[in-house]
Curated annotation (Swiss-Prot):
V-ATPase is a heteromultimeric enzyme made up of two complexes: the ATP-hydrolytic V1 complex and the proton translocation V0 complex. The V1 complex consists of three catalytic AB heterodimers that form a heterohexamer, three peripheral stalks each consisting of EG heterodimers, one central rotor including subunits D and F, and the regulatory subunits C and H. The proton translocation complex V0 consists of the proton transport subunit a, a ring of proteolipid subunits c9c'', rotary subunit d, subunits e and f, and the accessory subunits VhaAC45 and ATP6AP2. Signal peptide: none annotated. It is found in: Membrane. Keywords: Hydrogen ion transport, Ion transport, Membrane, Transmembrane, Transmembrane helix, Transport. It comes from Drosophila melanogaster. This is V-type proton ATPase 16 kDa proteolipid subunit c.
């Protein structure tokens, strides 16, 4: 340990960066898992009566998976910037924590929205095919919630 550990660069500074990286991947993966599970059960229920629509109905599952990629990107960026405490300020630790929480919680919210919309949309599309376009539009708006978190996280990361 270097003697450069100070009040600006405390020994626990990198802890906040690690928590930011962990928050980014954990919360966005939770959102992606919920979105995948919820829309996947809708696909399974729908495919009993309309098996020809399975591939068309896989879109919500793919969109939920993309949410986890947002968290992965931010987690890797933060993990790559971690350094020993003498070179890692408390300010950077807090910024990285904020970036991880921003993408993580927005990914969690987006995953919930994608799962609920995907489940109802897939089941509705099986009964009325004209609902497909509406489902896709609503899914795009839900996906953008996660993208907003990614943008804020990258902006914070570059500070």
């Amino acid at each position: 340990m270097s003697s450069e550990v100070s009040s600006d660069n405390p020994i626990y500074g990198p802890f906040f960066g690690v928590m930011g990286a962990a928050s980014a991947i954990i919360f966005s993966a939770l959102g992606a898992a919920y979105g995948t599970a919820k829309s996947g059960t809708g696909i399974a229920a729908m495919s009993v009566m309309r098996p020809e629509l399975i591939m068309k109905s896989i879109i919500p599952v793919v969109m939920a998976g993309i949410i986890a990629i947002y968290g992965l990107v931010v987690a890797v960026l933060i993990a790559g910037a971690l350094e020993e405490p003498s070179k890692y300020s408390l300010y950077r630790g807090f910024i990285h924590l904020g970036a991880g929480l921003a993408v993580g919680f927005s990914g969690l919210a987006a995953g919930f929205a994608i799962g609920i919309v995907g489940d109802a949309g897939v089941r509705g599309t099986a009964q009325q095919p004209r609902l497909f376009v509406g489902m896709i539009l609503i899914l795009i708006f839900a996906e953008v919630l996660g993208l907003y978190g990614l943008i804020v996280a990258i902006y914070l990361y570059t500070k």
